[in-house]
């Protein structure tokens, strides 16, 4: 699933090509995504100028004068810039054509993504109004993390992946940040010390920033706005390495399901 670094990589990749350009045409070949694509999407944005593209958590927000397109990549989706006359493949569900023979193409084999339209205040939208702070901003800090974790009995891994706590810390990066912080993923969130919160907060920011620099993590379907894969997979310490030697102590890494998500950790290095 594309996580925050992949979504931010996509935003940075497509924005320079499309910012300030006018929509010439909208082609929707399959409306049946996680939620149906609005029937009036073309009517809302055709001949309108794309002002900019924001990101909130894992959502991309395409800003027009009259509202926003809310885009979620789902489990297997990707957005890329193509020539407007490039023929679509079977999983290419949406094209938005702009001037200069450019188009934004949405590909989603599993169709768990979403393309929605709203003309309400964007941060008040029901998909966005409950979200926690962005992890790469000052609002997400160790004092916040320590305060928010008090009296929380759930495992720190499932807790940190809750978008009400902080957005965008998905499974890959939660595994990595916990390993780098030497924190056991099954540890109760409420048992984190202030020092552990200091380290954990720093490692979350570091892992996400490094992943963005590398263009995200491609494990299966993800490509960035330029059609290229992300390269952070080469930097992973634990995710996808269950049973292999820990890069620190060389003992085998443990893999198990936690909250229905694959969790990989070192029982020796993480306490």
Curated annotation (Swiss-Prot):
Q: Which UniProt keywords apply?
A: DNA damage, DNA repair, DNA-binding, Glycosidase, Hydrolase, Lyase, Metal-binding, Multifunctional enzyme, Zinc, Zinc-finger
Residues recorded as binding DNA, renumbered to this chain, are 91, 110, 152
The protein's GO terms of the molecular function aspect are: 8-oxo-7,8-dihydroguanine DNA N-glycosylase activity; class I DNA-(apurinic or apyrimidinic site) endonuclease activity; damaged DNA binding; zinc ion binding
Keyword flag Ion transport: no
- Which residues does the entry assign to the active site, renumbered to this chain? 2-3, 58, 261
Q: Which cofactor does it need?
A: Zn(2+)
The record ties this protein, via PROSITE patterns, to: FPG_CAT (PS51068), ZF_FPG_2 (PS51066)
The note on the cofactor says: Binds 1 zinc ion per subunit.
Supply one GO BP term. base-excision repair
The EC designation for this entry is 3.2.2.23, 4.2.99.18
- Its domain of life? Bacteria
Q: How does it assemble?
A: Monomer.
Q: Which PANTHER family match?
A: FORMAMIDOPYRIMIDINE-DNA GLYCOSYLASE
Entries under NCBIfam families matching the protein: fpg, PRK01103.1
Protein name from the UniProt record: Formamidopyrimidine-DNA glycosylase
Source organism of this protein record: Saccharophagus degradans (strain 2-40 / ATCC 43961 / DSM 17024)
